[in-house]
From Swiss-Prot:
This is Transcriptional regulator NovE. The keyword Transmembrane does not apply. Keywords: Antibiotic biosynthesis, Transcription, Transcription regulation. Transcription regulator that specifically regulates expression of genes involved in the novobiocin biosynthesis pathway. Probably acts as a positive regulator of transcription. Does not bind DNA. GO terms for biological process: antibiotic biosynthetic process. It comes from Streptomyces niveus (Streptomyces spheroides).
Length: 217
């Protein structure tokens, strides 16, 4: 378990994301004081509810700034998850203090902690977002690695990863259905009796047959 505020990637260094300004430590968010850093020789000031960007900031510097902000946002979710897991393991008072400190709701915190538990730091891919990992968190470790490796290699977005997983699961379900398909030879009278019974139960004929068979075993 880590409590240092780092993420790690599989086979790619420590995955740490720098979050302190170029000069000195970051100012605590709740202090109300700005935290300054420099891009393209120009000072950018981050406050709790505002980012002050100089008008003459170059496009290149603006892109670097945005990349850093997005990286910190994604990393901070991992940090919250690791912080919650540490608190759960160390103190047992699960979410009460966390909700008070972060002002996040119970379900959000539980999701962060759940994903952090599912992925030890060494299994996290620093080229993918927290949301990528959340998409596969319910799968087995082998399946998680399988899909995350594909996402890294093919540069899938979170939505594309979700689409591919759903398509795969849908294909598996279709295969299973094909394996259990039955062909029944019925006379018209019997078929009509079954249809009438299905209508009386507000079921399709297939669902009615399944319910009868399930009730007999």
């Amino acid at each position: 378990m880590v409590a240092s505020g780092r993420t790690a990637s599989k086979g790619r260094g420590n995955g740490a994301t720098p979050v302190r300004p170029t000069a000195g430590d970051a100012t605590p968010v709740d202090s109300g004081q700005p935290s300054d850093t420099t891009y393209g020789g120009l000072e950018v000031s981050a406050e709790r509810t505002r980012l002050r960007i100089p008008r003459d900031l170059s496009l290149e510097a603006w892109c670097r700034l945005g990349g850093r902000i997005l990286a910190v946002c994604d990393s901070s979710v991992w940090w919250i998850g690791d912080w919650l897991v540490f608190g759960q393991n160390q103190y047992g008072d699960r979410y009460r203090r966390a909700m008070k400190e972060t002002k996040l709701d119970y379900q959000t915190l539980r999701n962060y902690a759940w994903v952090a538990r599912k992925f030890e730091p060494s299994r996290r891919r620093d080229s993918l977002t927290f949301q990528h990992h959340m998409e596969v968190a319910a799968l087995s470790e082998a399946e998680q690695d399988h899909w995350l490796d594909f996402a890294v290699r093919l540069n899938w977005s979170r939505n594309e990863l979700r689409k591919q997983i759903r398509a795969s699961l849908s294909g598996e379900e279709d295969d299973l259905r094909c394996e259990v398909q039955l062909n029944l030879q019925l006379d018209e009278l019997r078929l009509e009796r079954w249809r009438e019974a299905a209508r009386g139960s507000n079921l399709t004929l297939t669902d009615w047959i399944l319910s009868v068979v399930d009730g007999a075993v």
